[in-house]
Amino acid sequence: MAIAIDWGSTSFRAYRFSADGQLLEKRQADCGIGQVSGQSDASRHAWFERILFEHCADWLDQQSITPVAPILLSGMITSRNGWVETPYLSCPVKLHALTDNAVHKTVRDTTLMFLPGVAIGAGDDQNSTDVMRADVMRGEELQLIGATGSSTDTEKSAGLYVLPGTHSKWVDYNAGCLQSFHTAPTGELFATLMQHTLIGALSDKGEWDAAVFRKSVEQGYHSTQFLSGLFGARAGVLLEKIRPQAVSAYLSGLLIGREIREGINMVIVSGEAVVDTAITIIGEPILCRRYTDALSTLGFTSQIPENDMAADGFARLLALM
């Protein structure tokens, strides 16, 4: 039997697998590490231990009958604000290298394996001032392992992968490696604009305006006046060019359109022809459908895997151990 934990800022997801890698059970709780942000290391670590063993106690009790492999942990639990900070592996990264570079910790006679993150620029000169080149991810690589593991043919799994969210990731995966990636803080910017700025202050609740969204996706992708376009959300309401109920769709479209432009440019620079294959989108269903709509508006094809990619990723890693 094996146990794996996907532990992020807002959620805790636990998976139990059989010896042959079949998913037996999944549990989820709103116990993200953000709940203890700002507390002392000792307080946070005690809380992490309590949460882990409370949610997995009955699974661990079975180890007297069925031996339990080390518990795999991925996500922000392995960050500087988590339980054990693990190093970043520099791209390009073969995904099996995650288990090879895991950090081990023993708690209550149970071995925990904290998986590393992935980075761009981690091996650069520490005196380098090229901050815009730096990038990191923790947790998304697990979903990528699941998405690329459906085929043993590395050519079939090669392509561009998008993981939308607070900090969206665009990943160039080919030749069996995570070659490069690009982060766009689209979700965080959208939330900030809507909740904490004058730009979003005139917005109002209402049904999603798909037409406004698609038009602003095109504007965000093609416009050379992106920043002033954001202010258009406020000016447009004042001049009655856009309804207050459509402001969220307008801002979302602008941000996602610009994100797509930057993500596509990342892969074009590396020489990949992204328009020749479907872009794979991994994440929450509603958000994935929004990105599919945006990509379709711009003439790109996309696909959304049906399975739980984190579970598939853990299963693939366990098979390599």
Cite the ranges covered by each PLM segment.
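Glycine-rich phosphate-binding loop plus the immediately following alpha-helix
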Residues: 32-40, 120-219, 223
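Glycine-rich phosphate-binding loops at beta-strand->alpha-helix junctions
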Residues: 11, 274-294
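Short glycine-rich, Thr/Ser-proximal phosphate-binding strand/loop in the N-terminal lobe
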Residues: 2-4, 8-46
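Adenine-nucleotide phosphate-binding core of ATP-dependent small-molecule kinases
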Residues: 219-262
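Glycine-rich phosphate-binding/hydrolytic loop that grips phosphoryl groups
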Residues: 293, 303-321
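Short beta-strand-loop/turn "lid" adjacent to the catalytic site in phosphate-handling enzymes
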Residues: 59-103, 108-131
